[in-house]
Curated annotation (Swiss-Prot):
CDD domains: cyclohexanol_reductase_SDR_c. InterPro entries: NAD(P)-bd_dom_sf, SDR_fam. This is Levodione reductase. Belongs to the short-chain dehydrogenases/reductases (SDR) family. Keywords: NAD, Oxidoreductase. Strongly activated by monovalent cations, such as K(+), Na(+), and NH4(+). Catalyzes the regio- and stereoselective reversible NAD-dependent reduction of (6R)-2,2,6-trimethyl-1,4-cyclohexanedione (levodione) to (4R,6R)-4-hydroxy-2,2,6-trimethylcyclohexanone (actinol). The active site is at 165 (proton acceptor).
Amino acid sequence: MTATSSPTTRFTDRVVLITGGGSGLGRATAVRLAAEGAKLSLVDVSSEGLEASKAAVLETAPDAEVLTTVADVSDEAQVEAYVTATTERFGRIDGFFNNAGIEGKQNPTESFTAAEFDKVVSINLRGVFLGLEKVLKIMREQGSGMVVNTASVGGIRGIGNQSGYAAAKHGVVGLTRNSAVEYGRYGIRINAIAPGAIWTPMVENSMKQLDPENPRKAAEEFIQVNPSKRYGEAPEIAAVVAFLLSDDASYVNATVVPIDGGQSAAY
């Protein structure tokens, strides 16, 4: 089975909530899960991104049920609103891909402003916490649920020039493990993925920061240290997320899964 092929019934009648659903990993995962029968609640700060993701989902799965909600994941009231919208529409939340995030500026720590640090941590860590806080209550009352948080290889090792991103993603790893220990007794599994160099709009922007004049050269040089010598693709991440949210991963809990072509082992 390839990363883009899938069973057709694994998520039938299951409701999956995806933040950051308007692009990149969120969109690819939405398409994957819809192909497997999921009902989707997609959340993003971009209404245009959400509409594009919904169109991509319906192209793959014309009968899919898709709810879209524009929200800033760092705003508690907006998080409450997207969770409420999901439960009012579907009645439950079986899976949660807690994925929204930004990269932020690339600067050494002494040049990384407090304002930029706060911005990145607010979205990448506070946003993950707020989503968990609201969704876990629902899952506990249901007696079941699966969560996948998006961390990063930058959350399991040092990467340099990204103080806010590294701090937030390390925090996501800690939050994942702590919450998994707390909620396993309620039939809830909480894991995280740690993507590496996956070619998404975020990584493309990162290359532009590294070399504004020649981002393609920066991209080619960056990937040479990766044992796989290539960038990953969003559907490859979606396949792992789908596994972790499915019953196939029924005894996988409190785990952080690198999806990086061997990058974290080589550094």
